[in-house]
Amino acid sequence: MHEQYQPLEIETQAQNYWKEHQSFLVRELPDKEKFYCLSMFPYPSGKLHMGHVRNYTIGDVISRYHRMQGRNVLQPMGWDAFGMPAENAAMKNNVAPAAWTYDNIAYMKSQLDSLGLAIDWSREVTTCKPDYYRWEQWLFTRLFEKGVIYRKNGTVNWDPVDQTVLANEQVIDGRGWRSGALIEKREIPMYYFKITAYAEELLESLDNLPGWPEQVKTMQRNWIGKSRGMEIGFPYDQASIGHAGQLKVFTTRPDTLMGATYVAVAAEHPLATQAAQNDPQLQAFIDECKRGGVAEADIATQEKKGMATSLFVEHPLTGDKLPVWVANYVLMNYGEGAVMAVPGHDERDFEFANKYGLPIRQVIAKVEGDDDFESSVWKEWYGAKDESVLTVNSGKYDNLGYQAAFDAIGADLEAKGLGQARTQFRLRDWGISRQRYWGCPIPIIHCEACGDVPVPADQLPVVLPEDVVPDGSGSPLAKMPEFYECSCPKCGQPAKRETDTMDTFVESSWYFARYACPQFEGGMLDRKAADYWLPVDQYIGGIEHAILHLLYARFFHKLMRDEGLVGSDEPFKNLLTQGMVVADTYYRTTANGGKDWFNPADVEVERDAKAKVVGARLKSDGQPVEIGGTEKMSKSKNNGVDPQSMIDQYGADTCRLFMMFASPPDMSLEWSDAGVEGANRFLRRVWRLAHAHVSAGLPGALDVAALDDAQKQVRRAIHLAIRQASQDVGQHHKFNTAIAAVMTLMNVLEKAPNQDAQDRALIQEGLETVVLLLAPITPHICHVLWGQLGHAEAVIDARWPSVDESALVQDTLQLVVQVNGKLRGHIDVAASASREDVEAAARANENVLRFTEGLSIRKVIVVPGKLVNIVAN
């Protein structure tokens, strides 16, 4: 055993052993309890960042711990390999996205291996490979035939110069990010998953996920957005509209119907189109609305604009004429593309009515207090629907609470055939068509005679050609007759293959299930293997995936269940959302007001007595730089630390130890070079103690019955550490406090007596415990030390240590003694001592006698096992 800790040598040795022995290869063992631990798979961007390292280390620690508990553990890894960054990189470097992607995968895989992750690489999936996406296409055809996938027109951002559809984030100030062209809203045919058909189940089954953070479940509940309300029909004013009909609106507040003063429709609504026929100004406004963003977030923050039409509808209860306005905040794809406006009690309508001088009618008032209604100032209570308000100015519906008004107005509307109670969801169907190249081809053939025909199963996969270099204009597949020209599977006539590809969220919605049977060729999933492994016992990923990815994966799991592919209802039993990795930022302001960001490694800092950074200068020129505070590690702020350089300098174990020790996994982790050095120092201490112990020759067995008091204290420290770490790692995932418990134990072992065989046998037990408790966290050093401590089997196959409760029993206890709440000494008493004996010992303590001299003792407070406080005056 080398005297010095040499991480490179140690880590190579451990990794070679795992490779040679296929230590991480796993099979279904029906008689063994399984544990499926999964970290969200990465996009192969080129190299790992610290966020990846943290995510995968957390997963690896949990996996290795459960393996030590005797479970059959699956920890797979793969690549979320389709997507826009590959297309952008391809255009920049003039290389096919496939080649760029596969090169990145090879490099990132070597980085993951260097971290020592216990991954079963035989189950690797790469989503851009046909053997993966063929099953996605197969499921698509099944769902299309059932109507769970359908085609309809959808509104998109269209770049007229690049002839392509842009994602919302690619539209900057209304212009295309690449071409700079003014973006248009366009209606194009798109494919949709009918996720709304599962809205109720997706909402209700959140209650069956006690292992998920409440915050994530709340975010999903809000996104699904179930609301109870009414669909109300406003009869057309035939004099202005020219024919009979109804404008249908959905509202959650029918109790305020008597306050409706106008209605607003979306730019795409048929009434808007009709009104604009002889009104060029209105047509210009409608065109402007259509050019706006299509994202709800954009619409929520943009300035509310509208224009009156010459059309009217009738109030369903009073018959009053209400003007029809076109407004940019009304979405055609929400409800019927129309809203009833009650400016008195809806903040958005209030703002709009004040802007355009529309009537504002109060129909709700506070029950108590003198807070008057003012039509010029919005107050929070205007929108209330609790016991604090009642209806007013509502005729026969006056003096009613929310529910009573809802019911009374609802009953009258239903009687007139102008309303019905309805439950609505905020959730929209999932549009998955993308006019992109680097994605999974949609398996549909368009035939003039037969319509949209799914590609038959025996003709799948529809393979994406991998040698294409996109140029950014239009869809490359739409320019490739060799791809799209085909014959109709139904009638044999010439037909055209669909050239859109699927949203990349589709691939990440079922990958967790394919890991159960990645080589299975008989179907999307091998039901037996899928039911053995699923659901995932522990899923780990960032909170930023709380809604879309996690909701789509839950939806897909239910689709697969309904296809008979899996037996469970939910994909992920427990969810851990790890915090971000943050680091200091430094910058200089440029002449044009921008910022040049400098990497912390290139900056020299000055700290105050509390180690806070108070000054910074660039190493290269010695000139000051501004301190930007701590931010998430990112390329844009240039504050990332390359994991590879850390591994090369300190070794993977140091990197892993720092990551797990610096903060609990669900909190942000602040990068600290000093913290990394501290982690490395600790591992050197462990190595040093083990080296000294092993060099003296391994001891014989420990005789637990023959321990003296000092030895009992050492053994107690060993088993306290086991108890603490078992709770922290196994139950709470608080790896930082588990590591702290091992550090405390190391302090005891370094000071422990080392005189005789019993002492040495005790240190042996202590070192074995240190190695076993650290094995999931720092597996390489523990692999080598376990062998050096005399074990033939590798630590990867060792069991987690169990607590010897008898070692925790103390014959004597040391209690703190206070006088008037101030520490004045310690006393040793028998563990079985009565309260009277403890009080007598405390009163007899020489310090107590000194500090109570001349005082009378009023009372003595005894906290069993901890302290005695003597109150005297």
UniProtKB/Swiss-Prot annotation:
Q: According to the UniProt entry, what is the EC number of this protein?
A: 6.1.1.4
Q: Which residues form the signal peptide?
A: none
Give me the ranges of the annotated region Disordered: 624-643
Transmembrane as a keyword? no
Which reactions are catalysed by this chain? tRNA(Leu) + L-leucine + ATP = L-leucyl-tRNA(Leu) + AMP + diphosphate
Which EC class heads this enzyme's classification?
ligase
Give the main localization category: cytoplasm
Keywords, comma-separated and alphabetical? Aminoacyl-tRNA synthetase, ATP-binding, Cytoplasm, Ligase, Nucleotide-binding, Protein biosynthesis
List locations, semicolon-separated: Cytoplasm
Positions annotated to bind ATP: 635
Q: Name one Pfam family in it.
A: tRNA-synt_1_2
Motif, 'HIGH' region: chain positions: 42-52
Q: What's this protein's name?
A: Leucine--tRNA ligase
